[in-house]
């Protein structure tokens, strides 16, 4: 069981360090790569800011219908929110590519910092 982070004033660097420390636990959720973007990556987060993460799943771990991916996604979200004690928004590369405003998707791709 992971220990919940009780500090609410984490920096982007601390979030990345925590993600690196939990790499083995993240493998349980089929995470291939995880990165931070948004206000925490830029260093302009507020006390109520959520944590924005870009997650690339190991798609080879799922069958051709991606059975179980939704459950893994939701479980990962709960795990991370528990870990950080904050709301976590997770995007995948596919969801970033589907953002209609290309400037937004390009900014996410440019600003992501991988753990």
Where are these regions (language model features)?
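Residue-level recognition of strand-loop junctions within catalytic nucleotide-signaling folds
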Residues: 56-58
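Catalytic core of pol beta-like nucleotidyltransferases
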Residues: 1-33, 42-43, 47, 60-115
């Amino acid at each position: 069981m992971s220990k919940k982070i009780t500090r609410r004033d984490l920096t982007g660097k601390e979030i990345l360090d925590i993600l690196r420390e939990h790499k083995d636990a993240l493998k349980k959720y089929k995470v291939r790569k995880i990165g931070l973007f948004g206000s925490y990556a830029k260093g302009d987060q507020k006390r109520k800011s959520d944590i924005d993460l870009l997650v690339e799943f190991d798609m080879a771990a799922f069958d051709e219908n991606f059975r179980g991916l939704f459950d893994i996604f939701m479980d990962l979200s709960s795990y991370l929110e528990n870990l950080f004690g904050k709301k976590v928004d997770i995007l995948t590369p596919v969801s970033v590519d589907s953002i209609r405003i290309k400037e937004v998707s390009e900014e996410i791709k440019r600003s992501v910092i991988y753990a």
